[in-house]
Amino acid sequence: MDLQPVDELWSDDIVRNDYNTHMKGMAVFEFSITDVPKLINDFYKETNTSSEDYHYYILHQANLYILKQLSRKCKIPMDKIPVSIDRFGNNSSNSIPLVLSDHFHAKAQDLRLFISGFGAGLSWGCGTININTDVIFPIVESDEFYKD
């Protein structure tokens, strides 16, 4: 049995194999601005809530354009969607705790937050948390790194 990956030329003229990660950006974008708003609106219906019931929306920081589209489609004011992608980029599943640490560590307050992660494998989910922000740690920056 040969377990070596087979190289193939893809439609974008790049040679890839099963070990290479490749995302179909437009499909993920369409998913993000179509399925995620539906998920959020379905959540409102299921929980008998609306956008006004949450202090902030902690959303996966895919890109700013997607965040703005979600804001528009779900009628969420942008000032209720903290943004960290401009400073930290797309951190995948880490983007939600990163937003929490970036925006809420300095001042203790009780908040009701809507959280939603979406992306890899076209997966998505959402929920709410009630939190006192004094339990959120600040971001720790360091020059340390791990050697292979």
Task: Locate predicted features.
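Hydrophobic pocket-lining "lid/loop/helix" segments that shape and contact the acyl-thioester
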Residues: 1-84, 135-148
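A short linear-motif detector with a strong N-terminal bias
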Residues: 35-38, 92-95, 106-109
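Short amphipathic alpha-helical segments at helix boundaries and their inter-helical linkers
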Residues: 63-73, 94-100, 130
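Short Gly/Pro-enriched loop/turn and capping motifs at secondary-structure junctions
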Residues: 63-65, 88-90, 120-122
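Active-site-adjacent helical/loop segments in soluble small-molecule enzymes
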Residues: 84-96
